[in-house]
Amino acid sequence: NTVSSFQDILMRMSKMQLGTSSEDLNGMITQFESLKLYRDSLGEAVMRMGDLHSLQSRSGKWREQLSQKFEEIRWLIEEVRHRLKITENSFEQITFMQALQLLLEVEQEIRTFSFQLI
């Protein structure tokens, strides 16, 4: 379940943040939260099926936003992979492995939602 996965990853990253003064980690947490909200809103639009007009009226540039989210996901995947390579802490390794898996799942969910809306 990606909802509980998001919560778990964010909680684990917050714990890691306490042990470091890394602004990068802070940025990653913010992007994960933003990604979760975006995925949830796309999911809601799909659940209301036929709500494409509502989605478009809220944001006439939803395709542009979709493209931007995919870029953010790719950036996060690269950032997580980089962190995974440089950390030797097992708690961090597990967290970043879970984050990577979550990002791949969410990318697929967003892709599926967007195809249904198109």
Curated annotation (Swiss-Prot):
SUPFAM superfamilies per the UniProt record, alphabetical: Nonstructural protein ns2, Nep, M1-binding domain (SSF101156)
Motif (Nuclear export signal): 9-18, 82-91
Subunit structure: Binds M1 protein. May interact with human nucleoporin RAB/HRB and exportin XPO1/CRM1.
Keywords: Host nucleus, Host-virus interaction, Transport, Virion
Signal peptide: none
Broad class of where this protein is predominantly found: virion
Record GO cellular component, one term: host cell nucleus
Stated family: Belongs to the influenza viruses NEP family.
InterPro entries attached to this UniProt entry: Flu_NS2 (IPR000968)
Disulfide bonds: none
Biological process, per Gene Ontology: exit of virus from host cell nucleus through nuclear pore
Keyword Ion transport among record annotations: no
Function per UniProt: Mediates the nuclear export of encapsidated genomic RNAs (ribonucleoproteins, RNPs). Acts as an adapter between viral RNPs complexes and the nuclear export machinery of the cell. Possesses no intrinsic RNA-binding activity, but includes a C-terminal M1-binding domain. This domain is believed to allow recognition of RNPs to which the M1 protein is bound.
Record's protein name: Nuclear export protein
Location(s) in or outside the cell: Virion; Host nucleus
Additional free-text comment from the UniProt record: Average number present in a viral particle is estimated to be 130-200 molecules.
Pfam families: Flu_NS2
The UniProt record lists the keyword ATP-binding: no
